[in-house]
Amino acid sequence: MSRVADTIARRKGEAAGALIGYLPAGFPDLRTSVDAAVALAENGVDVIELGLPYSDPVMDGAVIQAATQRALANGFRLRDGFAAVREITSRVDAPVLVMTYWNPVMQYGVDRFADDFATAGGAGLITPDLIPDEGADWLAASERTGLDRVFLAAPSSTEARRRQTAANSRGFVYAVSTMGITGVRTDVDAAARTLVGRLREAGALSACVGLGISSAAQVAEVLDYADGAIVGSALVTALAKGGVAAAGRIAAELARGAVRG
């Protein structure tokens, strides 16, 4: 079983759901991004999702785009992502998933990326613009290295796509709660509940919901039917406005919503 799946199973055993927290590597600088990720884990975040800055982030909303563009402007390089993963995993036990668009992985070399990422202590990849039937190289590399592979499913996904995604994901399936780009929303789209049910019918062992979650109440709402809640923009905003301490405080607030019952 994967480290991420182990974490989700442990939280289920504690009558709780998994809280997954996203931050971009290198924002506002590499050192601070590492310290912030550690602070999330120390304040109740179960799995760290570390975003690799990319020049064409088609799924990211304004908050995350601004953060990743600042990281790139400051000179972020892919090797910095591996260094960040290495230090985070040396300081906390929470597994670290990297969210990356596929082009940087291809440019680096899929096998080389998998090897270097696994050596750094990474748990797996979330690949928003890669679908399983176009990812044969990644499927092979992840099998060889034992890395998790988290594919996305949306409310618009066909039954065939949901089955393919469920069959090829390891760790969990990322259920996109609403159509569109990332960002804080007042209400988490009700389509997420239906999507998670359909993913379970398709064979998904675990499904975690992301896009739009920003409060403990929304975390609790999502964990009523999903295995994990993924929070990004709210944490990035806290880091941008108040630094590491603020990100930790928001993480602690969100974690209160992860306890069921």
From Swiss-Prot:
Enzyme class per UniProt: lyase
EC number: 4.2.1.20
Catalytic activity: (1S,2R)-1-C-(indol-3-yl)glycerol 3-phosphate + L-serine = D-glyceraldehyde 3-phosphate + L-tryptophan + H2O
SUPFAM superfamilies the UniProt entry points to: Ribulose-phoshate binding barrel
CDD domains referenced in this protein's UniProt entry, alphabetically: Tryptophan_synthase_alpha
Pathway of action: Amino-acid biosynthesis; L-tryptophan biosynthesis; L-tryptophan from chorismate: step 5/5
PROSITE patterns in alphabetical order: TRP_SYNTHASE_ALPHA
Phosphoprotein listed as a keyword: no
One Pfam family it belongs to: Trp_syntA
Domain of life: Bacteria
Lyase as UniProt keyword: yes
Gene Ontology molecular functions: tryptophan synthase activity
Entry's Gene Ontology cellular component terms: cytosol
InterPro entries on file: Aldolase_TIM (IPR013785), RibuloseP-bd_barrel (IPR011060), Trp_synthase_alpha_AS (IPR018204), Trp_synthase_suA (IPR002028)
This protein's UniProt keywords: Amino-acid biosynthesis, Aromatic amino acid biosynthesis, Lyase, Tryptophan biosynthesis
UniProt-annotated catalytic positions: 49 (proton acceptor), 60 (proton acceptor)
Quaternary structure and interacting proteins, as annotated: Tetramer of two alpha and two beta chains.
Protein family (similarity comment): Belongs to the TrpA family.
Function: The alpha subunit is responsible for the aldol cleavage of indoleglycerol phosphate to indole and glyceraldehyde 3-phosphate.
Protein name, UniProt field: Tryptophan synthase alpha chain
